């Protein structure tokens, strides 16, 4: 699945990239706005100010299956979760085919979010995003930037193994595995694992799941 961001992008360049992707047989696109630098304003942002605008453009360029981001705890720039869900509706109206969520460490947050989406009339498939923790400082920093809550049991795990990288990696894999098992048990058929370019993390989780995902 190709990832596209639209900060500083122009329509001509994106059309060229999408044409190349079509030529390679790529069908699935994850369309994201991307982070806007603090010193960037106005026309510097490019042709697209919002992810929904990028999604609509991609749909116009070819027969792509387009995914977008969803935020179970709200986007950091949104004033409230309700406002963020309204922004998610714009993505659906723009033709998004599925949503991939920001990381979360408490599945209850996702289940409550799903209820809110359905109540708002949003019923496109939602793929939960799971991030196994492998670095204590990194995960705390990411959570601070994204507004992701750290449940007590997760925080205790990170603090306990913060100075033991291999132990933290094993604990992170175990915690993520537990999240995924619970998601599968509650009807989710797909998850997106944020491995941070560490394929051994994915391998460890799949080894733990074993027969649970064996078709």
Please report, for each region that a protein language model flagged, where it lies by residue.
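Active-site beta-loop-alpha junctions enriched in small/polar residues
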Residues: 3-9, 32-36, 69-75, 104-105, ...
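Short, well-ordered coil/turn segments that N-cap beta-strands
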Residues: 25-27, 62-66, 96-97, 122-126, ...
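Short, acidic/polar
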Residues: 11-19, 79-90, 172-182
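Ligand/cofactor pocket segment of small-molecule handling proteins
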Residues: 61-97, 105
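Conserved, mostly hydrophobic/aromatic
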Residues: 21, 91, 95, 128, ...
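Active-site-adjacent beta->alpha loops and helix N-cap segments on the catalytic face
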Residues: 9-18, 35-58, 78-82, 103-119, ...
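Active-site pocket-lining/capping segments in soluble small-molecule metabolic enzymes
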Residues: 45-71, 119-173, 178, 209-215
